[in-house]
Amino acid sequence: MDSITTAASVVAAGLAVGLGAIGPGIGQGSAAQGAVEGIARQPEAEGKIRGTLLLSFAFMESLTIYGLVVALVLLFANPFAG
Amino acid sequence: MGSLSFALPFAELEVGQHLYWQFGNFSIHGQVFMTSWLVIGALLALVVVGTKKMERDPRGVQNLLEFLWDYIRDLARTQIGEKVYRDWMPFIGTLFLFIFVSNWGGALVPWRLIHLPSGELGAPTADINTTVALALLVSLSYFYAGLSNKGLRYFEYYVHPTPIMLPFKIVEDFTKPLSLSFRLFGNILADELVVAVLVFLVPLVLPVPVMFLGLFTSAIQALIFATLAAYYIGEAVEEHH
C-alpha cells in the first residue's frame, strides 16, 4: 500500500471512532440524567430503571461500535490496500 | 498492513489472522469452529447433567437450569406475547445461551496457552462470520414466524400505518441483520482488543477492571441479541387492528 493511502486510512480510522463517540456520549449522558432523576423521584423503581438504562446504553454504544468496525476495516482489512 | 501482531508471551495481539481449513472450494476459519464446538459441547454437557436426575426440589445444576428457563421464558413472553412465545422460546434460549457462553468463554478461558500454527483461539462471536450467520437465522425466523402465523396477511405489516412506510420497512429488513451482526461482532472484538492492548502496555493489575467491564458488556450483548431477536419475531406475529 502506498504511503498516502496508509496515512489517509489511519487518519480516517481515528476520525471514525472519535467522531462516532460524540453523539452516543451526549446521548448516554442525557439517558443517565433521566435515570438518576427517575430514581431520585421513585427509589423503589431502581431495579427496573437500571435494566432499561443498561439496555438503552448498549444500543447507543453500538453506534460507536459501528465507527470502530469501520476503523478496524480500514486498519486491518483495507479494501484500497491494492 | 493486512494484519498486526506483537510478540510478548501473554500479550499477543492478532487481528485478521486465521487458521484456515480447506473444505472443498471454501476456506473456513478453523479456530472459530473449534471454539464453537467447545461451547456447544459445554452447553450440551450442562443440560444433560442437569436433566439426568430431575427432582421435585431442584438442586445444583437443575436449579441453575430452571433459573435460566424462567429467565428465557420471561424474556420471550414480554417480547413475543402470550400467544406464540412458547414456539420461539427454544430458539431465543439457544441464541442467548450460545452467545453468552461464547462471549464469556472467550474472555475467561486462557486460550493463549494453546498455540495454533496461525491465528488464535477466542470467542467465536468475535468473528464476523459467526455473528452474520446468527443474524441471518434471526431474519429467516421472523419471516417464517410472520408467514406461518398470519399467512400472506403478514405483508400488511409493510403498509401498516400508511403505505408511505413501505420503502422504510423494506430497508429495515436489510438493516436488522446488519446492525444485529455488527453490534455483537464489534462489541466482542472491541473487548478483546482493549484487554489485549492494555495487557501489552501494562501487564499487571490494570487490565483486571477492564476485563470485568468486558464480562459485563458481553453479558449485556448476549441479552440484547436475544431480546432483539424476540422483539423482531414479536413484531412479525403481532396482530394489527
UniProtKB/Swiss-Prot annotation, chain A:
It is found in: Cellular thylakoid membrane. Its main location: membrane. It is a multi-pass membrane protein. Pfam families: ATP-synt_C. One of its GO terms (molecular function) is lipid binding. It comes from the Bacteria. GO terms for cellular component: plasma membrane-derived thylakoid membrane; proton-transporting ATP synthase complex; proton-transporting two-sector ATPase complex, proton-transporting domain. F-type ATPases have 2 components, F(1) - the catalytic core - and F(0) - the membrane proton channel. F(1) has five subunits: alpha(3), beta(3), gamma(1), delta(1), epsilon(1). F(0) has four main subunits: a(1), b(1), b'(1) and c(10-14). The alpha and beta chains form an alternating ring which encloses part of the gamma chain. F(1) is attached to F(0) by a central stalk formed by the gamma and epsilon chains, while a peripheral stalk is formed by the delta, b and b' chains. Belongs to the ATPase C chain family. F(1)F(0) ATP synthase produces ATP from ADP in the presence of a proton or sodium gradient. F-type ATPases consist of two structural domains, F(1) containing the extramembraneous catalytic core and F(0) containing the membrane proton channel, linked together by a central stalk and a peripheral stalk. During catalysis, ATP synthesis in the catalytic domain of F(1) is coupled via a rotary mechanism of the central stalk subunits to proton translocation. Key component of the F(0) channel; it plays a direct role in translocation across the membrane. A homomeric c-ring of between 10-14 subunits forms the central stalk rotor element with the F(1) delta and epsilon subunits. This is ATP synthase subunit c.
